Structure formats: C-alpha cells, structure tokens
C-alpha cells in the first residue's frame, strides 16, 4: 500500500513510531539469532545437499517430514503420489526431483514422502512482504515467513549461498529437506519473495497442474533467481510461467522504481502493482490477500505494516528500520519463523533472523 505523503511533525512522528514498535519486545537484529549459512554448489551432482544434511539430526528431519505430511496431505493425495511417484518424478523439472531423491536416499525416506513434503510446504505459508524505496532511490525488500510447526522448522531454517563456478550465483532462505525457495536474492540484479494466495481446493488444483507440467511456486522462484539476468526478466518469468497454484510474487530491483507485487493465477498474472514514488507510492505491502480488496478483520497484518512504514518515513527507511516494521505485532506473530531483509544493490547485507526462538 502506498504512503500517504502527508507531513507528520517530527515529535508526533517519533511518538507514533515508538507506540507502533512497543509490541516488538526490544527485538533488534543484533539480539535476534540468525540461521546457519551453507554453500551449495550447483556444479556438482544432485546429491549436492548431502554436506548440509550431515550437520543435522536425521531423526529430527524425518520427524518434521512425518508431521507435515500427516497434518497437511489428504490421504487420497498420499495414496495417489505413492502410486505415481516415479511418473511424477519424470514430469517435474530438473534439478529439483534429483535433489529430492538424493536427500531421500540419505534420510532413508521414500521418494513419495520427499515429493509430498516439498509440495506440502507450498501450502499455508502465511507471510508479509514489503518492497520499498527510500528518498535517495535505494530499494529495500523484507519479508516475514509465518508457518505452523515452528518448534521444528526454526531448527531447520538455513541461509544458502548457491554457487556456480565457485561464485555466489544467488542466496536464499529455506528449510532443510526443502529444495524450493520462498525468499531469495540475485546479487546486483533483484530480490524476490513469495506469499501464498489461498484460492481453495488447493490439492485438487495441485495434482491436476502437476500432471500438466506446471511449476511449483517455490521452484519457479529458485529457477528465476538462477537464470534471470535482470529485474525485468525476473518479473516477466514470474508473471508468465504456468504454476500449480496462485501466489503473490514480490520483486525488488537495484534502480529507483524497481519494485512490484505480481498477483498470480495459475495460468498468468491477475495484476501487477508497481512502486511509483513520484505519486507517493514509495512502498508496497503484500500479505495473503489481493491488495485492491480490504484485508479481513481477523487477519489484518496489512494495516499495522502500513502505519509503521508511514511512521518511519521514506527518509529514514533502511534495512534496520524495515526489520523493525516487520517486528510490529501482528505483522510479527507467534507463527513467524523468520524475517529476512535484503537489497539487491547491497547483496552482502542479506540478513535473516529466526523469530520466536524460545
């Protein structure tokens, strides 16, 4: 949502910001733990995740897989995937299925379970994403990822630097055992996050779309980070590629006005909403609802985020203040697994913090 552009007197601005941040509980980037950081080389075999997996308790990862599948996957889907796992493996795009198979072999999981847990994570990811431009034209991007099973997933959250030819090709935040990305950065090119767009009948749509060779949401995000050479190329790919489900893609670039929220249907874009600072639209806030519709009263994270951004002000926007905005309750809540702030023009400042670590 855009800034109002209304001037706020300095004292009132400070008081309002302090009130909005009162629910943060003193949370700062310095006092909040970050996840482990690993390198994954895309130049080696699909078993490339094994050096990372060796840092984790296999039983913890297996327990997470069992819990997510047990709670999130209907029995009819489980039976269908178990019967058709090998066929599905051939239909889905490389390198993802080969990576999943490599993980399954190491973790002693069936291929069906590996595929299902990766698909289950595509569902029920309630999130807040913000892309914003400061008064000097710098673009910042932040996101909270909210998800159940926090007691396990916080222990399995990692930052990953994906390497090509020994160099960092892109960076992302994910869970151990999950090959997709909901959050990532291509250095000096663009940043991207994904927020779920719940349209109902999710598993039916997913199964039908899979057999049409449509892409899982998080796999397209990772592929775009790997292959798109510019902000514009990323937006085009994310807007046009057929998907297994609806989603919001939030993209930030390196130049002024390079920021959009793409509202996706499975077959293409429903809406593309750009930054327009010259008209007062210096930030965009996307949760899990179409931006042109009112947020539901029972889950309005949008309005508190907008108030916090306006209280912060465009001139004071930074990665640190964006982190504070994402720490305002209920933008930050009991389901928040992690917060990431990033700016493609300053890729070394990519930062993830685990939330609710206790």
Swiss-Prot record:
The record marks 143, 288 as: Important for enzyme activity. Its EC number is 3.5.1.60, 3.5.1.23. The active site is at 127 (nucleophile). Gene3D superfamilies: Penicillin V Acylase, Chain A (3.60.60.10). Keywords: Autocatalytic cleavage, Fatty acid metabolism, Glycoprotein, Hydrolase, Lipid degradation, Lipid metabolism, Lysosome, Membrane, Signal, Zymogen. It comes from the Eukaryota. Glycans are attached at residues 39, 108, 310, 334, 356. Degrades bioactive fatty acid amides to their corresponding acids, with the following preference: N-palmitoylethanolamine > N-myristoylethanolamine > N-stearoylethanolamine > N-oleoylethanolamine > N-linoleoylethanolamine > N-arachidonoylethanolamine. This is N-acylethanolamine-hydrolyzing acid amidase. N-glycosylated. Tunicamycin treatment causes a reduction in specific activity against N-palmitoylethanolamine. Autoproteolytic cleavage at pH 4.5 gives rise to the alpha and beta subunit. Cleavage gives rise to a conformation change that activates the enzyme. The same catalytic Cys residue mediates the autoproteolytic cleavage and subsequent hydrolysis of lipid substrates. The keyword Transport does not apply. It is found in: Lysosome; Membrane. It comes from Oryctolagus cuniculus (Rabbit). Belongs to the acid ceramidase family. It holds the Pfam family NAAA-beta. GO terms for biological process: fatty acid metabolic process; lipid catabolic process; N-acylethanolamine metabolic process; N-acylphosphatidylethanolamine metabolic process; sphingosine metabolic process. One of its GO terms (molecular function) is N-acylsphingosine amidohydrolase activity.
